[in-house]
Amino acid sequence: MDKVHSAECLEQSVILIGIFLMVPLNVPEQSKAIQEVIYTRSISHWKILLLRFVMSILILIMMICLFSGIMIWKNCTFPFMAYVMGTVISAMALGSLGLAVSIWSNSGVAGYLASAGYFLLNSMGSVSDGSIFYLFSMGKGNYMIKLYLLGWSLLMVVISLIYVEKKRDC
């Protein structure tokens, strides 16, 4: 595959891994009985969520590197690091949105639906190519949008962690 088709494969298929790795990070603590136990611990819940988030990012990077390495091994030609980082950022944006919605709504299903809806809006063309929320910009050679996606997804995670900490205080 050439650069354009490789970007299409990575951006339209592989980024879905982010949904499955990040959305369920808060699901174990969504029960009221479990929340009572968690909020009495000495370690803050937001620290546990941050650790889970970092671990899921590391696993995401390893999985995308492995998949991209197999693509190179099977004679696909593309800039490895640029495409891996772009794919990781898009997957992180999808997963971060789902994680944030899951935390804010206290429902894992809502997180999955938000991430799937965001992906479908991008796939159907409802999000324009020039938008800072466009997931598939690598195939068009626009990497600047990926920086906006990275900032947006990190901001959502930080706001969600602050929300978890404030919710504990209430």
Where are these regions (language model features)?
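Amphipathic alpha-helical segments used for helix-helix packing
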Residues: 36-38, 66-67
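Secretory targeting signals
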Residues: 1-27, 50-115
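Short helix-to-coil transition segments within interhelical loops
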Residues: 37-46
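Terminal transmembrane helical anchor/hairpin motif
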Residues: 108-170
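A cytosolic-side transmembrane-helix exit/cap motif
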Residues: 27-34, 100-106, 130-139
